[in-house]
Amino acid sequence: MEVVLSVQSINKHYPGFTLENVSFSLAPNRIMGLIGKNGAGKSTTLKAILNMVSPESGSVTMFQKNFYQHEKECKQRIGVVFGGIDFYPLKKLSTITAVTQKFYTNWDQAQYQKYIKHFSLNESKKFKELSSGMKVKYLLALALSHHAELLILDEPTSGLDPVSREELLHIFRQIVKSEKCSILFSTHITSDLDRCTDDITYIQNGRVLQSADKDTFLRSFEHLKTPDDTGPLTLEEIMLRTERSEWDDDITV
C-alpha cells in the first residue's frame, strides 16, 4: 500500500516517560487523528517525527524517503501547525508571510491570496491580534501556499469554541479533497475524530494501543462493551473505558 508517512518503532526516553516502539502509517488523501489523553505522548510523537526531538531509535519515511536523511527536501513538501504557537506576535501577517515564503522553492502567491481571502484574514493585523481559530487558519494558509502534500498539526482545535472547531474540521475535509494532501493531527477531543477522520491512532502512556481505519478501530474495542450496551461504542466511550481500566489497575497495584 502506498503511504505518504511511515513511522516505525520510534523510541524516546525522558525521566518519568518513554515513547516506546511507536509505529503507524498514513496513506495519501487521508486524515488520521492521533488520540490520547493529555501527557500520553501525542506531541512528543509529532516532534520525534519532525526531528524536533531526536528519537533514540526508529525511522520515519515520508514520500518514500528517509526523513532524517532527507529532512530539508521533505520539509519542502509538508506543512506544520502547532497550536498555541505565537511566533513573531508583534509582526503583521504580511511581514511574517514575506519571511516564510523565502524558505519554499515552490511558493505560490496566487494560492496564498486565495486562502487569505477564503479564510477572511487581514494581512495588516498583527499575529497576536488574531483569535485562536484565525491563527490556525493563517498557519494553514502558509502551509497550503507551498502546496504541502502532508499537514502535521498538533492540537489544532484546542481552545476553540464549538462553532470554530466545527468550521476548522470542515476545512480539513475540504483541503484533503481539493488539495490532494493528507493530514495527521493530534487531539484529545474525541468528537473531532467522529467528524472528520478516516484513520485513528490511539496512544496511551507512550505506546500505540491501536492504529487502523475508523471502522476497524471501533470494532477492535468491542470487548469493552457491557450487557447494557445496545449499540456500538462511541470513540468517547472507548477512550473513557480504556483509561478507566488503567486507573483501576493502578489502584489494584
Regions found by a protein language model. Give the residues of each.
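Conserved beta-strand
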Residues: 7-10, 17-27, 58
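Helix N-cap at the start of a conserved alpha-helix in ABC-type nucleotide-binding domains
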Residues: 162-164
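Catalytic Walker B motif of ABC-type/P-loop ATPase nucleotide-binding domains
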Residues: 151-155
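Conserved ABC transporter NBD signature motif
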Residues: 58-69, 73-74
